[in-house]
């Protein structure tokens, strides 16, 4: 059904009876020259507006805001009521502007206070308003033409705002009854006409205005449904600025508007051209411009609106960007704006600044952290728009890193399991209706939420936080325990899984326990199984209330966890034996380390003594009185000498390196020439002297002198 909301048609009915010429009694200072006044000049007396003037100004302000933000498809019809109804404009788009309305109101003029009040009534205007609502607008006619034979599907709704001076609450009820009867009669006429439409819904807003200082004879009343077609609400408001504030509040309610206050606007002072001051300007726009604030929950941005408005205003600061490239910020929405105080100097300066082709970036006020530019003011085609800039992460950027979250590195998360979890909880169209046990219709969305709640009752996000979800043996139980109801086969599979875990514990099979962040070998095998059983019990207990069969699974689990006394005794003996093995293993390791150190020290001493002997031999080998050299074996045969007894434990790194160096040096050493030519390992000395002097050597190889 093509529905036009109540905001599509708005009819203003303003009372033009003689009592509306009465003063509102709210004085306005006419003579503002309080300084440098010449003595002897009498100041002008303050003036006050009439109830009629206050009503016209407030209604015009209502229309101005509506036309600024909704130049199309939001229509206003203005009616003045005295001795008859005077319709000032029509539903055509050409008549929808302030100039036409103000020219028509000027032609009507103020009410005549000397006219006969008995001949004047607001009822004439209310009847004309109902008749006007039955007329078809251009947009409704276009929609009916497109639908052709289904033209009756186009809706017709509207709103009547009546500003009058009622006498009492009974007078207000009489006006409501008149409107209700008139709607009923005109709906009958419209049913038989091709040029009229029946009123499907009408909102009647009665505003009782009275002079300042008087007591109100009419009580306020919130919106009340008088019939399926008519709803009514009553507002009792003092004239003057109070009436203007009330109309400002109503226009925000009727058209879903929100308020934004621009703070810290730098402006030149008129008196001092070299100085500037900061001003604030409040703007009205559609509430969708604040959707991001509502989603993010930034409640601290709100503040009280001017004149005690019913809604809070969002405060944004004038921002001076470091770059002139506005295209760096991409826009997600643009909404027309309307200043609340359009005639004030700050509002005028801001609008002129924007209409000259300038743009203003707006940032969220923050006590700490970097600035967040969330909105921008700019004009297009002579109209000012509030642009919403995306202050969140762009979908084109890389996703944020989760390394700073609870899991640490990305690989620590159960990413594969989470993908399977999402696949099992996808939303799909649900065509066939389903019913609950009690016979009520089951809503697919609620059923999906309930399933998601069941699957997330116990679902660790990090691999190191779980044991059972890392075990393939637990999958048959974990996959079915989240169901709303279990079959006998499901219960049997769960019991088999539990018995399989008991068998694993009896065999002392290892478990996939994460040791990240722990020192040593981690928890003992008995402690690992205790952790596993506790986690499995937590999972089953999270779903125990689903059905009776879930209770049977828990009973089986608890029965298997309660071990017999001999089993506990065996576990204790096993733990004692493990402790003894750990102690003996530690003692053996300490002994082997000490033994290796002693062997390395002994080998080091042998090598040092060998170096000393070689040095002494070098010193005395050229001396004529040198004694007979001791019997020495060739160095090449050092490998044949008995090695230092190796320890039964592992050889130290020093021993391995020393042996390697000694072997390499022995192969590089040039052997002594006498040892190479010796007989029976004995070499004859000074043979060249014998050859020169003819001396003979003794038997033992020593030369004798003559």
Curated annotation (Swiss-Prot):
Pfam families: Mat89Bb (PF10221). InterPro entries: Cell_cycle_regulator_Mat89Bb (IPR019355). Its main location: nucleus. The modification Phosphoserine is found at residues 623, 626, 678. Belongs to the Integrator subunit 13 family. Component of the Integrator complex, composed of core subunits INTS1, INTS2, INTS3, INTS4, INTS5, INTS6, INTS7, INTS8, INTS9/RC74, INTS10, INTS11/CPSF3L, INTS12, INTS13, INTS14 and INTS15. The core complex associates with protein phosphatase 2A subunits PPP2CA and PPP2R1A, to form the Integrator-PP2A (INTAC) complex. INTS13 is part of the tail subcomplex, composed of INTS10, INTS13, INTS14 and INTS15. Interacts with transcription factors ZNF609 and ZNF655. Interacts with PAFAH1B1; this interaction may be required for proper recruitment of dynein complexes to the nuclear envelope at prophase. The cleavage module binding motif (CMBM) mediates recruitment of transcription factors. Component of the integrator complex, a multiprotein complex that terminates RNA polymerase II (Pol II) transcription in the promoter-proximal region of genes. This is Integrator complex subunit 13.
